[in-house]
Every structure is written in structure tokens, then in C-alpha cells.
Amino acid sequence: MGSIDSTNVAMSNSPVGEFKPLEAEEFRKQAHRMVDFIADYYKNVETYPVLSEVEPGYLRKRIPETAPYLPEPLDDIMKDIQKDIIPGMTNWMSPNFYAFFPATVSSAAFLGEMLSTALNSVGFTWVSSPAATELEMIVMDWLAQILKLPKSFMFSGTGGGVIQNTTSESILCTIIAARERALEKLGPDSIGKLVCYGSDQTHTMFPKTCKLAGIYPNNIRLIPTTVETDFGISPQVLRKMVEDDVAAGYVPLFLCATLGTTSTTATDPVDSLSEIANEFGIWIHVDAAYAGSACICPEFRHYLDGIERVDSLSLSPHKWLLAYLDCTCLWVKQPHLLLRALTTNPEYLKNKQSDLDKVVDFKNWQIATGRKFRSLKLWLILRSYGVVNLQSHIRSDVAMGKMFEEWVRSDSRFEIVVPRNFSLVCFRLKPDVSSLHVEEVNKKLLDMLNSTGRVYMTHTIVGGIYMLRLAVGSSLTEEHHVRRVWDLIQKLTDDLLKEA
């Protein structure tokens, strides 16, 4: 009784007053303040170090150990964001960010994210958000048309598509669908016979998703690639591996082909691989997370040759089509296989439209039940910019990558290690330019570059060769930025070789 009285007293003496978590005019005022902050951040992002200079654990020293009991004014919070959060950011928005693959952004996508957040709908079934469901179906068909995918991947045909969070989720869903199709024929005890194929260049999430789908770790085949195939999968090697597995009593289940590997943007020959997959009844998925976006340009569309024989395809507009994270598009040729594997139908979600099988319920196309109104930002991007400007954006990045490649080739101290397919350039200092071991001297150069704060690049090792990666693609990058990073590379190389 005493504790209840104390609470009542505390509440009656509270200075907070009536609590309204959302009040239109106050939101308008605060949102204007936040938009100004964001616009200023984008405007000035080049003045910040690209790679954060803080030490691990820095933030715990600056943030109180407990949450505030009483509310704090937005002005104080904004000051702390500038003082404590921004210094700890590796600035992916910087025009001098060339690491990994840049996460692209745009005004249209930001507005779409704002609207999606504001509406806050949860579109797990059609009835829970009809507009969210139907716009996603339309946008997925739009993008499929732009990519010149066959009708078998569209809702207007016999297939369909869904916007997932990431490529990992897309591949997990398709492996599960392939697994269920196989086990319906073979029986559940045969799961130990199922084999999945990728390459040693396939994204690291592939073995993880296979394991999550119940594939035995020893049954995950990562096909070795070589410089002779530009680190793409050799159809001959794949065929031999599949034939050996069949002879040993295994069941080939799933093949993940990649358009634009993370290390070097290597491309697997979809046309040839799909023929082998179809011959052996293997579900073939094309992971085009990065390079698939380039296929909206006619000059790159040939990378999708053979797509009519593929079972599923995914690409991530957040990598190159100006959409904020997260946004991955997954198309499947036979949606019923996905639905058979992933459908749930609890009593509390049942409704007349779903029961009559008249609508799409996207909860049955993904792992989770809940989902955002993800299609809004893609809809705004496509309408605000049109295909022509998206193609121009892709071509501009590729042109800057080609320009950087030419500068590298013109300097006799450097070499291009693997062919440039898109806007990523993989290069290194040659073995004979320094008394240091070739890997050591290239590591030193990368460390020197990143320590300046003026650029952020990463490395990879392919075929036993350590190389530097420069990935053009930030939404803010222009030709003069690429020119400046090359000037910086040359200057630091001069300094490094003098020391060596």
C-alpha cells in the first residue's frame, strides 16, 4: 500500500505534465530542425574524416550509464548528436568513401522513407495495408520490366516479387523453398543428402544461409575459381562436381550464381550455369545485389542472358539505385513454391480476402511477419528520376571507375589485378617497386591512405593476391573527388617508396 501511495505522490509532483508522444505542430517544428541538421550534414560531410577516428568504447565514456527519468529538450539532444555521435560515424555518405560497396541515397528515397515511417503501416496481409501490398506488386513489376525480365518473374505474368531487407534473407527464403520442394519428393530423412553450390567468391552469407536452412555444413560446395575465368564459376568445374555428387548418392539442390562479387565484381556465366542447373533439377538463384542494377542499362543487360532458365533473382537498390538501406528485391518464377515453404495462417490474421485466395499476403513471402511500407521509396525514385536518370547515374559511376583504371595503368608502379567490369577497380603496387614484400608494401599504402581521413578504401585477397579496392558509387562522388584520391595515392606512394 505504501509503495502505491509513493508512486501517486511522485506522479502528482511530476513536472512533466500531460504526455503526448505525437502532437502535429510540435512534430512539424522538430522535424524542420532535424531536416536542417541532415541537410547540413550532407552539405558538410566532406569536412569530416571519412573513417571514424574514435577508439573502441569511446561512447560509453560520454553517455550516462542510465536513461533519463525526466525528458530532455531536443536542443540538448541535437548538441550531443553533433558532439558525441557524429565523431563516431564512419561517413558512408562521404564522396570520398570508396570502401566495400557504397550505400546510395537520394532525396526521393529519403522522402519515401519519411512517408513510410509516418504511415507506420505493417503490411503482413493485404487487408492490413492494401496500398502497401499493391504498390509493392506494381513497383516490382516496373523494375522487372526495366531489367527486361521475362513475364515469368512478374505478377502480370506467372511469377512475382517481394522487397526483402537484405540479400541474405532473399537467399535463405529461396533455399528453404528449394529444400521443401526436394523433401516433398524424397522424404524428410533425406535432408542429409541435399547439396548447395556457390563459389569461393560467393558472398560470405551463402554458407550461413545454407546452415540456417538445415543444409549440412559438409554439403556446402564452394567451387574454386581461377584467374583464367576472371574468378567466375567455371561451368565445366560445376558439371564435374555435380556429377560426382550424384554418383556418390547426393542430391544437388541449389546453386547461387553471382553478378558482381563483393571482392572484385566477378560475374558468373548465368547462361551456361542455368543450363546445367536445369539439366540436374537444381534451383538456381542469381545474386545480383550489386551489379544487377547496372543491367537497367542496355550495355550491361547481357550479364542476365539465360535469366529465363533461372528460378529466382535478387538485387539490392540500396547499393546502386539510390535507395536507402534496406531494400533488396527478390523475384521468383514459381511463387507457389515460396508460399508452400513459408506460409503461416494463425487465427488472429485470418480474413475473408486471404481465405478466398484473392490477394497477396507478403508475410508468406519472407521469414518475418511484420514489414514496412518498403515500396514507397522505390516508387518515388522511379517516378522522380525516371529510368533515364538512373541509367545516367550508373554510367557516370562506371565512367569514373574507368577513368581511375586508366590512371592506374598509366603509372608503371601499379597494376590492375583483375578486370574492371563496373565501377570497382582492384589494383596494387607491383612486386618489384619496393624491397618490402609486395603484400606488406600494399598494406602500408592502404593504412597510410585511410589514416589521412581524406579517403576510406578496403582490400581483398583473391587468388592469393592482396589488392586494394576502390569502389566508385557514393551518391555525392564527382570526377574531381576521384581525381583527388588518385593524386593522394600517388603522393603517398612517393613517400612510401622513399622510406622503403
UniProtKB/Swiss-Prot annotation:
Modified residue annotations for N6-(pyridoxal phosphate)lysine: 319
Biological-process GO terms, alphabetical: amino acid metabolic process; carboxylic acid metabolic process
UniProt keyword annotations, A-Z: Decarboxylase, Lyase, Pyridoxal phosphate
CDD domains: DOPA_deC_like (cd06450)
Cofactor(s), by name: pyridoxal 5'-phosphate
Result for mutant: residue 348 to F: Acquires the capacity to produce indole-3-acetaldehyde from tryptophan
GO molecular function: 5-hydroxy-L-tryptophan decarboxylase activity; L-tryptophan decarboxylase activity; pyridoxal phosphate binding
PROSITE patterns: DDC_GAD_HDC_YDC (PS00392)
Binding site for pyridoxal 5'-phosphate: 168, 262
Protein residues bound to L-tryptophan: 102, 203, 318, 348
EC number(s) per entry: 4.1.1.28
Impact when changing residue 370 to S: Acquires the capacity to produce dopamine from L-dopa and increased accumulation of phenylethylamine by gating indolic versus phenolic substrates
Keyword Cytoplasm: no
Gene Ontology CC terms, in alphabetical order: cytoplasm
InterPro entries: Aromatic_deC, PyrdxlP-dep_de-COase, PyrdxlP-dep_Trfase, PyrdxlP-dep_Trfase_major, PyrdxlP-dep_Trfase_small, Pyridoxal-P_BS
Primary enzyme class: lyase
Reactions that this protein is recorded to catalyse: L-tryptophan + H(+) = tryptamine + CO2; 5-hydroxy-L-tryptophan + H(+) = serotonin + CO2
Subunit: Homodimer.
Role according to the record: Catalyzes the decarboxylation of L-tryptophan to tryptamine and L-5-hydroxytryptophan to serotonin, respectively.
Homology family: Belongs to the group II decarboxylase family.
Name of the molecule in the record: Aromatic-L-amino-acid decarboxylase
Native organism: Catharanthus roseus
Gene name tied to this protein: TDC
